[in-house]
Curated annotation (Swiss-Prot):
UniProt KW DNA-binding keyword: yes
Protein name in UniProt: MHC class II regulatory factor RFX1
DNA-binding region: 438-513
Comp. bias (Low complexity): 45-73, 127-136, 370-379
SUPFAM superfamilies in the record: Winged helix' DNA-binding domain
Pfam families: BCD_RFX, RFX1_trans_act, RFX_DNA_binding
Gene Ontology MF terms in the entry: DNA-binding transcription factor activity, RNA polymerase II-specific; RNA polymerase II cis-regulatory region sequence-specific DNA binding; sequence-specific double-stranded DNA binding
Glycosyltransferase among keywords: no
């Protein structure tokens, strides 16, 4: 049985003595002291309290003597539980922790010179209904409470009572009561007002926290004479760590009523004794005249509170809060059975009614498809206030703890991530219904991985097909999205795609390699990007066995962290490849009349040629099978990587065989021989050009995004793989190999980007509304102004520009396909470069046309931008595609004119940082060709108006970079007269 504590009120000197009371008993002005300057606590001493008065028992108050002036005391007791009288000062047992508020207020005016004396006992206490809200306020060592009440005895006369700076030292008694007694003459219809507002409970350190409770007097309409209607209000009370109950008695005794102004009465420094810091539970007390929607009681000793503060009595909140906060406690389920998987889960209570289920988060899948009854709800956490714990089918509202109060769990699933999936008989607006078959279907066909994404619409289409096969009723897309996020945790949503054609994707989700949905994706050409970011530390090993290699994934490596290996789906992707293409024959190695290095014989040269041919054929084989990761292994095998690493495993049999055919020492000597370097460069160009045509036979043909991403990841890894494999190989050979590999990687990146642009532009060109908008915006472009600005730089003929403009508009109006647009661009290139066909100036003219095309198209886009064209995004996409495809056409035309492969043409300028060759090996030859073709350039019908400006020489056709090396001012100085 918890004992009750009493609070002693320090008595003031009688009125006959001089006003020498302590500071806390002296009258002070009504304004409360600032919270920043709390008064220090005054310990109770005998000198300060010559006549102490103890409140013995408030449950059953005893008669007291009438105070002077006909004063009456009204004792307001919240619990209203009578108890037998006890001796003065003795602790009173209490059956349950309770809390009292007793206010003693005297009416009438006091003089400033008079002091406060204690009230004489004898007044009869009466219980009145006071609307209140229980507030708990305790700090570690000290506590200050400021209560202001005002009693209006007559109209115009108010006697406020202020109680400030209650210091509660840390002592030991189990209970705490706050008693406020209010006394008023029965002959007057005075009104006492005490209001409770905004009670909050917070955790605070053991220091003084000012708490103010301001009350305002109010009149009650229609109050009968002789009654004292009271309204209790407490403003801004902060409640800290709960302790035991405490009783505080405040009594104010009036003097004889005298005419004069009303003086405020202030009592400070009330120090209760015998207080212990213990956990206290506040009992919900039924209070008359208080509505349940306006009063909220806090139960329990923990420091957890509702989502909102305690309701104010001046504003009605008819609804209960939706969420209640519970302690962050992890609940562990019982041992799972064959139909129930149990993992640690953190439950969050949700205030609900009926059989509303509670949310469960953190567990993978907690399911019970057969359990029913009260024990079927053991998968959720404790049920909060207002609802029981939910389970497989949602427990009843009466249960609390780890099980619901009943309910059925048949045919239901509990999914991780905070979603309760009910059975078909239930219908919840905020939950998602899914059958176990659907959840299992998701787990069987999809998996999470880094760096991949899957279109959201595609996933929903797969779900609709699944529901059709299983004869299930599908949910809408939004509910299905919640299910996806519940089954696969950590998914993010990204909007991927080009401007105007982007779609939402689930980032971090892909289709499993064993799923039959891959064939469906192939038909729809909506492949998930199964490519993964490259990590040199951990890479996947190939699927199929190669000579000297092993199958599968190496021990200790994780497939989800390495470079993607799509060789498992080679049958699905080979239709997009040109696997029938074989490696062309290599030319014979020409020694150029040079002497072989010392120690190298003709047989070694022949062995090198045979081994390198076999090496290149092996690379073609693994590329056709999409085993990209094997390329690094083949490089390491040929260049004897393991032989140069003493810490590596013993050399394999394939290394021993290669070592017998061509020792590494001879290989190193040949890597410095110039004829071998030139032959290797030529072979690499042929090899890489063949690989490009195998992987991307048609840049405009749709390619699955998974294959595209795998190719791009492979291109990103090429140079680092090659550099790592050619350790201890002479620098001369390394430069040749890296230059060719760099050109190969750049070509793969450009072609995959071109293919991506082509697919995006294909959707735009097939959209009639977008085509009409583009045509309308293009007709508003001032091409005369564009030609005037561009002609100074491009020097294009007006008739040629007008013809291109008209052809572009006609092709756009006819809504031609992407292939028809490509044919039109190819015709433009052929027409422009026709005068240079077969001449030495063809490469230079082709490059110059590419610069002029790009500059002119940028001027058109600039005009559309300034006009804020609605179809600017579509034009920007089309412009990017046409520029890239024009680059592709020029590249192949120049390579054809030079009799080389496009890889060889691009390799001339590759690896600029490490190459020791000049920037342009053919620079001197091209400068001679420029002089020879001086009379040919003005004859171009589309690039220049032949002979219109004699002042402009042929040097203006040079790219700006080369002009800067000769005469940077020539173009501008000579062009001024004609501008």
């Amino acid at each position: 049985m918890a004992t009750q504590a009493y609070t002693e009120l320090q008595a003031a000197p009688p009125p006959s003595q001089p006003p020498q009371a302590p500071p806390q008993a002296q009258p002070q002005p009504p304004p409360p002291p600032p919270p920043a300057a709390p008064q220090p606590p005054q310990p109770p001493t005998a000198a300060a309290t010559p006549q102490p008065q103890y409140v013995t028992e408030l449950q059953s108050p005893q008669p007291q003597a009438q105070p002077p002036g006909g004063q009456k005391q009204y004792v307001t007791e919240l619990p209203a539980v009578p108890a037998p009288s006890q001796p003065t000062g003795a602790p009173t047992p209490s059956p349950a922790p309770q809390q009292y508020i007793v206010v003693t207020v005297s009416e009438g005016a006091m003089r400033a010179s008079e002091t406060v004396s204690e009230a004489s006992p004898g007044s009869t206490a009466s219980q009145t209904g006071v609307p209140t809200q229980v507030v708990q306020q305790v700090q570690g060592t000290q506590q200050r409470l400021l209560v202001q009440t005002s009693v209006q005895a007559k109209p115009g006369h108010v006697s406020p009572l202020q109680l400030t700076n209650i210091q509660v030292p840390q002592q030991a008694l189990p209970t705490q009561r706050l008693v406020v007694q209010s006394a008023a003459p029965g002959s007057k219809g005075g009104q006492v007002s005490l209001t409770v507002h905004g009670t909050q409970q917070v955790h605070s350190p053991p220091e003084q926290s000012p708490v103010q409770a301001n009350s305002s007097s109010s009149k009650t309409a229609g109050a009968p004479t002789g009654t004292v209607p009271q309204q209790l209000q407490v403003h801004g009370v902060q409640q800290s760590v709960p302790v035991t109950q405490e009783r505080s008695v405040v009594q104010a005794t009036p003097q004889a009523p005298k005419p004069g102004p009303v003086q405020p009465l202030t009592v400070q420094g009330l120090q209760p004794v015998h207080v212990a810091q213990e956990v206290q539970q506040l009992q919900q007390v039924p209070v008359p005249h208080v509505y349940s929607s306006q009063v909220q009681y806090v139960e329990g000793g923990d420091a957890s509170y509702t989502a909102s503060a305690i309701r104010s009595s001046t504003y009605s909140y008819p609804e209960t809060p939706l969420y209640t906060q519970t302690a962050s406690t992890s609940y562990y389920e019982a041992a799972g059975t064959a139909t129930q998987v149990s993992t640690p889960a953190t439950s969050q209570a949700v205030a609900s009614s009926g059989s509303m289920p509670m949310y469960v988060s953190g567990s993978q899948v907690v399911a019970s498809s057969t359990s029913t009854g009260a024990g079927a709800s053991n998968s959720s956490g404790g049920g909060g206030s207002g609802g029981g714990g939910g389970g497989g089918g949602g427990g009843g509202g009466g249960g609390s703890g780890s099980t619901g109060g009943g309910g059925s769990g048949a045919g239901t699933y509990v999914i991780q991530g905070g979603y309760m999936l009910g059975s078909a008989s239930q219908s919840y607006s905020h939950t998602t219904r899914a059958s176990p078959a659907t959840v299992q279907w998701l787990l069987d066909n999809y998996e999470t991985a880094e760096g991949v994404s899957l279109p959201r619409s595609t996933l929903y289409c797969h779900y609709l097909l699944h529901c059709q096969e299983q004869k299930l009723e599908p949910v809408n897309a939004a509910s299905f999205g919640k299910l996806i996020r519940s089954v696969f945790m950590g998914l993010r949503t990204r909007r991927l795609g080009t401007r105007g054609n982007s779609k939402y994707h689930y980032y971090g989700l892909r289709i499993k390699a064993s799923s039959p949905l891959l064939r469906l994706m192939e038909d729809q050409q909506h492949m998930a990007m199964r490519g993964q970011p490259f990590s040199q530390k951990q890479r996947l090993k190939p699927i199929q066995k190669m000579e000297g290699m092993t199958n599968g994934v190496a021990v200790g490596q994780q497939p989800s962290t390495g470079l993607s290996d799509i060789s498992a789906q080679v049958q699905q992707y080979q239709q997009f490849l040109d696997a029938s293409r074989s490696l062309p024959d290599f030319t014979e190695l020409d020694l150029q009349g040079k002497v072989l290095p010392e120690g190298v014989g003709p047989g070694d040269i022949k062995a090198f040629q045979v081994l390198y041919r076999e090496h290149c054929e092996a690379i073609v084989d693994v590329m056709v099978n999409l085993q990209f990761t094997l390329v690094e292994t083949l490089w390491k095998t040929f260049w004897r990587y393991n032989l140069s690493q003493p810490s590596e495993a013993p050399p394999l049999a394939v290394h021993d065989e290669a070592e017998k055919r061509l020792p590494k020492a001879i290989l190193v000597l040949l890597s410095k021989f110039e004829p071998v370097l030139q032959w290797t460069k030529h072979c690499d160009n042929v090899l890489y050009q063949g690989l490009v045509e195998i992987l991307i036979p048609d840049v405009l043909r749709p390619i699955p995004s998974a294959l595209t991403q795998a190719i791009r990841n492979f291109a990103k890894s090429l140079e680092s793989w090659l550099t790592h494999a050619m350790v201890n190989i002479p620098e001369e050979m390394l430069r040749v190999k890296v230059a060719a590999a760099g050109a190969f990687a750049q070509t793969l990146r450009r072609y995959t980007s071109l293919n991506h642009l082509a697919q995006a532009a294909r959707a735009v060109l097939q959209n009639t509304a977008q085509i009409n908008q583009m045509l309308s915006d293009l007709n508003r472009v001032d091409f005369a102004n564009v030609q005037e600005q561009a002609s100074w730089v491009c020097r294009c003929e007006d008739r040629v520009v007008q013809r291109l403009e008209q052809d572009f508009k006609v092709t756009l109006q006819q809504q031609n396909s992407l292939e028809q647009w490509a044919a039109w661009l190819d015709g433009v290139v052929s027409q422009v470069l026709k005068p240079y066909q077969g001449s030495a100036g063809f490469p230079k003219a082709a490059k110059l046309f590419l610069l002029k095309w790009s500059f002119y198209s940028s001027m058109v886009i600039r005009d559309l931008t300034l006009r804020s064209a609605a179809s600017f995004g579509s034009f920007h996409l089309i412009r990017l595609l046409y520029d890239e495809y024009m680059y592709y056409l020029i590249e192949h035309r120049v390579a054809q004119a030079k009799g080389e492969t496009p890889i060889a043409v691009m390799g001339e300028f590759a690896n600029l940082a490490t190459s020791l060759n000049p920037l342009d090996p053919d620079k001197d030859e091209e400068e001679e060709e420029e002089e020879e073709s001086e009379d040919e350039l003005p004859q171009d019908i589309s690039l220049a108006a032949g002979g219109e400006s004699p002042a402009l020489g042929p040097e203006t056709l040079e790219p700006p970079a080369k002009l800067a090396r000769t005469d940077a001012r020539g173009l501008f100085v000579q062009a001024l007269p004609s501008s």
